[in-house]
Amino acid sequence: MEQRGTFEHRVNRDLVPVCPILGVEVAAIDMPWLLSFTEEHLKALSGDYICVSNVHTTVTAYEDPSYMEVQNGGIMAIPDGGPLSSTGQKRGFPQMQRVTGPDYMHACMELGIAKGWRHYLYGGTQQTLDKLANILPQRYPGIQIAGMYSPPFRPLTEEEDQADMERIAQAEPDFLWVGLGAPKQEKWMRAHQGQVNGLMV
């Protein structure tokens, strides 16, 4: 699935310190920095995406130029893998710490309760989403789940993809948590950059 048209970031990517690793512009950040950045720029980040990068995705990008473009095409690629943050520290970025996708999601869900942030979960099995529908409100009382959807594992038709976009738009999320597995999820975010409501992660 190719990206449709061009996308201009509404937040300056130069605000994000980066440590290039095998060509991937990995954000040289820690969790407090990321949460502060998210809170300050969330509205302007709608339609953009964050890659959650580890050794596997970084090596895959090094070997596949099209995937490298995907990894570097969002607002940032956060260092989910410990070796990435360790490499950054050795290269002169002492502030660079491992920031995992699940930790970021849970931090945003907790922080977002008081702020009224709305979350949409896209991907995974229906069984997993059903469990999350029960677990998340218990763990984060007051959380706003805008929607959940488990798409087919096969490639979607244009009609199905458009229906997904309309479903997400109607839900008006602040965050779109994409769980399709790498590299599919990153390619999906790149293809839908600028077409969805919410920050994709």
PLM feature segments, named:
Residues 181-201:
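Catalytic alpha/beta core domains of metabolic enzymes, predominantly
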Residues 168-182, 198:
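Proline-aspartate-enriched helix->loop->beta-strand connector
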Residues 54-58, 180-185:
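Short glycine-rich anion-binding loops that position phosphate/pyrophosphate groups of nucleotides
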Residues 2-98, 102-103:
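N-terminal nucleotide/polyanion-binding subdomain common to many enzyme families
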Residues 63-64, 89-91, 133-134, 188-191:
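Short amphipathic alpha-helical segments
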Residues 11, 85-171:
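Conserved beta-alpha
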Residues 75, 146, 174, 199:
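Conserved acidic residues
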Residues 47, 117, 196-199:
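A short helix->loop->beta-strand "cap" motif at the edges of active sites that frequently abuts
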